[in-house]
Amino acid sequence: MVAFYAYMDTHETNPGRHQTLIFDIAKTNIGYAYNTNSGLFTSPDHGIYMFTWTIICESYGFVYSEIMINSAPFGSILTNSQSITNDHTVTGIVVAEVYQGDVVYILTNPNQPIQRGILSDTFHRTSYSGWKIY
């Protein structure tokens, strides 16, 4: 069995373009395939996996993010609260065939700017999770 759930312990106040997001608190890490120091999930074996990631941006901000398999984008989301005075939350979900040794991680988009910060605290968590389906 392989499954993990991790979140950012604190806000990321100044994320840059093309930055790997590190979810440094792993609440679940069955199989120990997620690394809290690097933000990378390394697949222990071939299979079909589901991955989700949730990004919370500050009010009047926006964050583009992508889920990467090795060095290729597999999915993306935009968290945008530019026109509202509240924080904004978006979750991306993908199902992917992943091979042993493949690396899956969340990256800020290399071509899009980021405005304001990524939020994560006791009341709302920016998080990343994945598990093997088959």
Indicate where each model-derived feature is located.
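Extracellular jelly-roll beta-sandwich "head" domains, especially the C-terminal globular C1q domain
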Residues: M1-Y134
